[in-house]
Amino acid sequence: MSMSIDSNKLLLRKGDMKLDNYPTCAVEALTRLETLIASRNKQNMVMQIISEFIFLERTPKDGDVRKSQALPISQMNLFQEFQLIIALIEYFSRPGRDATRNAIFLSLFGSHLTPQRSKLLSRLISTAVSGSVAPLLSSAGTWMQQVGCKTPLSLEVAQNIVSDFISYSRKTPEQLKQLPMVGPHFAANFMVAVADLYLNEQRSPTLNPPPDALLDTITEWMMENPTLCQASQQPLVLPAGAIAMPFTTPLAGLLRWVVLAPLVSNRSAYSNLHLSLLRALQQLVSSGESTALPSQDLMQIVKSLQSYCARLAESKTDPQADAAYQKCMERFAQAVQIALSSNCITNQIQLLCLLESLPPHKLMKIVIEAHKK
């Protein structure tokens, strides 16, 4: 169906926006967007259609300067949200080009969302996980990379998945366990985000471990497929002219988990995850400017260990006699050794110098001396 528009108004009529016509108008709008989205000079029109006919957002009148600076307000009720989620699931499940699907998804959910769109996005992705909707999860993985896996939007999506499938579920659903096979790129980017939520002193003054079921799920993913972390390096399928944002692998965040875990937990799952990460590092092939283990992420681990050692000093405990610290350093040294050998750490000398500032550990000392030459 062609999309003809005069200079003042869209072909889609206001009368089409009656509640009894929803979500028909949203479905029609999605179809029409496919022909518009390739035209760079029609992006404002695309955004207007999305806001008005898909999300039912009301924009304040231009005459009121104060109101015009406010975010558009969605007039959708819960039932209409449910209808839209079903319509989007069906739309993204249709045969079509990945580039078109990704362009539509990025237009629907950009990097600056209203609270209503953000909540709907989280519900949409959880529904896609529950229904194993591979095409939508593929687009969601692309979206996460484009907006940043550690941005508040991506973290909200990750936290919502944890809440839906872990926190409020007695048993981890099979759909979540099978996620790497259904949507490997999304699963890898989900791990980047969720790893940032736990055992991270930049987000909480205390080291909060991940829920046991989440740890077990990610450990199972990594044990079955150590190369899953590399799925985030897959080339993105974007519309013409779009620039792919740098990828981030989950390796650094998960490494922080296993290194710092002895300070708060003695679960054996961390040992299994550690071994899987070592295998993943061994299989890693560094390419381009984006490396698997940015030194600043590893330095964050060092700072957490320094803080722990400072607390040990206050209690007059020798780090060499502290079993938790020794276990942390053993895991850290093993990972650093393999990562350095694989040449996948940036600013290696700076990292080695910072590692020397930690209380001495026999294995780490050997690693530092071997690579500082």
Curated annotation (Swiss-Prot):
Location in or out of the cell: Nucleus
InterPro entries referenced in this protein's UniProt entry, alphabetically: INTS15
Pfam families: INTS15
Keyword Cytoplasm: no
Cellular-component GO terms for this entry: integrator complex; nucleus
Keywords: Nucleus
Family: Belongs to the Integrator subunit 15 family.
Function: Component of the integrator complex, a multiprotein complex that terminates RNA polymerase II (Pol II) transcription in the promoter-proximal region of genes. The integrator complex provides a quality checkpoint during transcription elongation by driving premature transcription termination of transcripts that are unfavorably configured for transcriptional elongation: the complex terminates transcription by (1) catalyzing dephosphorylation of the C-terminal domain (CTD) of Pol II subunit Rbp1 and Spt5, and (2) degrading the exiting nascent RNA transcript via endonuclease activity.
Subunit structure: Belongs to the multiprotein complex Integrator, at least composed of IntS1, IntS2, IntS3, IntS4, omd/IntS5, IntS6, defl/IntS7, IntS8, IntS9, IntS10, IntS11, IntS12, asun/IntS13, IntS14 and IntS15. The core complex associates with protein phosphatase 2A subunits mts/PP2A and Pp2A-29B, to form the Integrator-PP2A (INTAC) complex.
Name of this chain's protein: Integrator complex subunit 15
Organism name: Drosophila melanogaster (Fruit fly)
